[in-house]
Amino acid sequence: MEPSESSTRELTLEEAVSFAILLQQNEQLAEAHEVFRRVLETAPDHPRALHYAGVLAHQQGRNSEALALIERSLALVPDQADWYSNLGIVLQADDRLDRAIDAYRRAIAIDPSHANAHSNLGVLLRATGKPVEAEAAYRAAIRLKPEHIDAYTNLGILLNGLKRTEEAAACYCKVITLRPKHREARKLLALAHCTLGEVDKAVDIFEEWLEEEPGDPIARHMLAACTGRDVPERASNGFVETTFDSFAASFESKLARLSYRAPALVAAMLEDSGLEHSHRLEVLDAGCGTGLCGALVAPFARRLVGVDLSQGMLAHAKEKNVYHALIKAELTDYLRDNSEGFDLIVSTDTLVYFGDLKGVIAALAGALRPNGLLVFTLEQAAGGSAGVDYRLELHGRYSHSQAYVERLLTFSGLQSKIVQAQLRTEAGAAVPGLVIRAAKSVSVQQAEV
């Protein structure tokens, strides 16, 4: 049987672009990239091919290329609301918030019913300190698309930060109605109940969650945070991996909305130490996350190593191009297994996932070379917490008393300087923290705790 003409003919350009988009939607990104490449070789100014090749470049982490391609497509066809919305997403990922806001506004001007553009605009208005406008944008998205889960979730987070906790809880309830097993909304609703003094309702949410998913690390950890019962000595590996893998892509933009200052505070503490930008030191970024500290400590480093438990976070750290090695490992295990040692160790917002710090601080001290320096941040327990070494807070991180930290550093043979500072905001309130610098002398003798 001879093949028919229709089964052997070449695709038209439009068919090829549509096929590439289908591959893209099915997450066959390499195959889609090849089809777009061949189309653009034939027709370099094909608007749809340019645009969706740009979207693909963004999906593959090539934001500069994505931006150039999408802007070329819009120069050719400037009346596409979806395309401006996609431009906003790329600009937002690149932390160009003002331009992203403009892109979302252009999308809305072209198509006022574009719910996603309204929702994403709300995120950026909140990030740039415009809560009233952000609320209006979220509500516009919900009015246009009543099942818009992201808009309801983000509106709830905004309202919670404005101390409108009951309204926030109503938003989370709506999300759960739309998607009953939405993990973030379940967690946020339970925490809202805790804030309102309705601990029993929070417990019910987490216990129902654990009945459905026994051993779920998020539910188990947050149940302990709400009740103060069965508090673990540190967050489990599962909790850390699940939490940070789930929002690695949006991690930096979320921290920007929280006025996150930990990396800058660590950099200031290093400057205060008199350490020179010599590129001579072996440096460890302990709990490197997406690499926010990497560029700040790179000038000190002959070799810079980043360690983190989240593969998603490490993937973003790699894009910073400042690390000589990135290693997926639990921090204490890595430190104990490492035999080379470091001249400088920095750690921001990592030890807040440890309650009992004795083991990890001993491991950090053991990994320091003589005259080595350790700089890290912790959240400070409220009111000094006399007699309390650490506490698991409602947000799921641990806070520590300064006296406890000083005692452990002395026990580990480290000479310390501790500065109190605001690390970030959370739910509209400042989060008090400790910025610690600890030095290891040539001769170290441990004392009794």
Q: Could you describe each region identified by the protein language model?
A:
Residues 358-370:
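A short glycine-rich, Lys/Arg-flanked "PGG" loop and its adjoining helix->strand segment in the class I
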Residues 336-345:
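A short acidic, Gly/Pro-enriched loop at the edge of an enzyme's catalytic core
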